[in-house]
C-alpha cells in the first residue's frame, strides 16, 4: 500500500541519491568516512531510482544471473533479479552456507576475510552480474569473481550504488566493467 511510509519523489535522481547517502565520520573506526545507504532505503523514490538505473544499464547485456555480495548487495540484487526474471546467487561470508561451496579468502585493510558461494548455484556458461552497495578496494568483488569463474560462469560486470575510485579498485579488478550510480573521489565529508 503506497503512502504508509515516507515517499519522496526526487526532482533529480542523482542529486537525491547523494542527499540520501549518509556520510558518517570515524565509523566504524577513526579516520574512516562511512557511506551509509540506509537513507536510500528510507526513500522509496530514491531506491526505485537505483533499481530503474540498474535495469536500464543491463537490459540489453544478456545477463543470465545476478550474484549479490553479503549483505547489502542482497538489497539491490533481489529486486533486480525479480525485474529481470533471472536467478539470484548469494555470495556469503564463510560458514553461512550449507553444502558444497567454492571459497575464496582475500585481504582487508584490517585483516582477512573469506566468502563462499554454493557450487550448485554457479552454472557453467552463465553470464553473471556481480552486485553490491559499494565498491571500495575491490577485494570482495575479486574474490566473488574468482569463485564464479571456478564454476565456469562468465562475470560480465559489476554494479554498485556507490563507487570509491580513490581507493583504486580498478587496480585489483582489472578489465571487469564497473557501473556505479555515484562516485566519491576523496575520503571527506564535504
Swiss-Prot record:
InterPro entries: Ade_phspho_trans, Adenine_PRTase, PRibTrfase_dom, PRTase-like. It is found in: Cytoplasm. Pathway: Purine metabolism; AMP biosynthesis via salvage pathway; AMP from adenine: step 1/1. One of its GO terms (biological process) is purine ribonucleoside salvage. GO terms for molecular function: adenine phosphoribosyltransferase activity. Belongs to the purine/pyrimidine phosphoribosyltransferase family. This is Adenine phosphoribosyltransferase. It comes from Treponema pallidum (strain Nichols).
Amino acid at each position: 500500500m503506497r503512502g504508509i511510509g515516507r515517499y519522496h519523489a526526487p526532482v533529480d535522481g542523482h542529486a537525491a541519491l547523494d542527499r540520501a547517502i549518509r556520510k558518517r565520520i570515524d565509523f566504524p573506526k577513526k579516520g574512516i568516512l562511512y557511506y551509509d545507504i540506509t537513507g536510500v532505503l528510507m526513500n522509496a523514490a530514491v531506491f526505485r531510482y537505483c533499481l530503474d538505473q540498474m535495469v536500464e544499464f543491463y537490459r540489453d547485456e544478456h545477463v543470465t544471473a545476478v550474484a549479490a555480495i553479503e549483505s547489502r548487495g542482497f538489497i539491490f540484487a533481489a529486486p533486480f533479479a525479480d525485474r529481470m526474471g533471472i536467478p539470484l546467487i548469494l555470495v556469503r561470508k564463510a560458514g553461512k552456507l550449507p553444502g558444497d561451496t567454492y571459497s575464496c579468502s582475500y585481504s582487508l585493510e584490517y585483516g582477512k576475510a573469506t566468502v563462499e558461494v554454493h557450487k550448485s548455484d554457479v552454472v557453467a556458461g552463465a553470464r553473471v552480474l556481480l552486485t553490491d552497495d559499494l565498491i571500495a578496494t575491490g577485494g570482495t568483488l575479486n574474490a566473488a569473481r574468482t569463485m564464479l569463474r571456478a564454476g565456469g560462469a562468465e562475470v560480465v560486470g559489476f554494479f554498485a550504488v556507490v563507487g570509491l575510485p580513490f581507493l583504486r579498485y580498478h587496480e585489483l579488478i582489472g578489465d571487469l566493467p564497473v557501473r556505479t550510480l555515484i562516485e566519491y573521489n576523496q575520503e571527506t565529508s564535504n
